[in-house]
Amino acid sequence: MARLILFGPPGAGKGTQAKHLVDLLDIPHISTGDIFRAAVRNQTPLGQQVQAYLDSGRLVPDELTINLIQERLHQSDVQKGWILDGFPRTLAQAEALEKLLHQINQPYDRVLSLTVPEEVLTQRLVLRAEKESRKDDTPEVIQKRLGVYWKDTAPLLDFYRNQQRLATIDGNQPESDVTAQIQHIVDQLKGEKIV
């Protein structure tokens, strides 16, 4: 069983590594974006609230996001663990998530933080935008997204480091090497739980 929070700036390879973890551990990859889309598509009461925020171009409030995550973590496929991606993004969200996970007795095992130099991130995101024909990912938008990450989200690394639950992985190496490093960390977690 593993409960992991995947962390890193846009372009660090979180989605790629999440796919490897899903295959390795047979646990669900939970992204806030997917949760929002599913709730809206299913027109749940929470989904209708999300739709109202998205339609008006506003950010979905933390409390609503936490409620959706709580709903997702009560589904049967998370019994063996989960990979949470895209949340938390701020200290307030991290604290709310800590409280929720404590309440539902599903503490996370590790925060896996992928680190990549900013110039490499920019190159990756520009290439991805070209490859996927994403016109909204202009160099200016990419810089803004990275700026938001460094300002709002990166400070959470200290929060998790202080709890001694942070594992930092060099994401600026071949994909298979990153995967091997993550697998080693997961194997160590399994060993800790046996002892």
UniProtKB/Swiss-Prot annotation:
Function: Catalyzes the reversible transfer of the terminal phosphate group between ATP and AMP. Plays an important role in cellular energy homeostasis and in adenine nucleotide metabolism.
EC number of the protein: 2.7.4.3
Protein name as annotated: Adenylate kinase
Oligomer and partners: Monomer.
GO biological process: AMP salvage
Protein localization: Cytoplasm
Region named LID: 127-137
PANTHER family hit by this protein: NUCLEOTIDE KINASE
NCBIfam families linked to this entry: adk (TIGR01351), PRK00279.1-3 (NF001381), PRK02496.1 (NF002700), PRK14527.1 (NF011100), PRK14528.1 (NF011101), PRK14531.1 (NF011104), PRK14532.1 (NF011105)
Domain notes for this protein: Consists of three domains, a large central CORE domain and two small peripheral domains, NMPbind and LID, which undergo movements during catalysis. The LID domain closes over the site of phosphoryl transfer upon ATP binding. Assembling and dissambling the active center during each catalytic cycle provides an effective means to prevent ATP hydrolysis.
Organism whose genome encodes this protein: Cyanothece sp. (strain PCC 7425 / ATCC 29141)
Binding site for AMP: T32, R37, R58, L59, V60, G86, F87, P88, R89, Q93, R134, R145
Reaction(s) this enzyme catalyzes, per UniProt: AMP + ATP = 2 ADP
Keyword Cell membrane included in the entry's annotation: no
Top-rank taxon: Bacteria
Alphabetical list of InterPro entries matching this protein: Adenyl_kin_sub, Adenylat/UMP-CMP_kin, Adenylat_kinase_CS, P-loop_NTPase
Region called NMP, residue ranges: 31-60
Enzyme's top EC category: transferase
GO cellular component: cytoplasm
Listed pathway(s): Purine metabolism; AMP biosynthesis via salvage pathway; AMP from ADP: step 1/1
Family, similarity comment: Belongs to the adenylate kinase family.
Keyword annotations: ATP-binding, Cytoplasm, Kinase, Nucleotide biosynthesis, Nucleotide-binding, Transferase
Residues annotated for ATP binding in this entry: G11, A12, G13, K14, G15, T16, R128, Q173
One Pfam family per UniProt: ADK
GO MF annotations, alphabetized: adenylate kinase activity; ATP binding
Gene expressing this chain: adk
Transmembrane domains' residue ranges: none
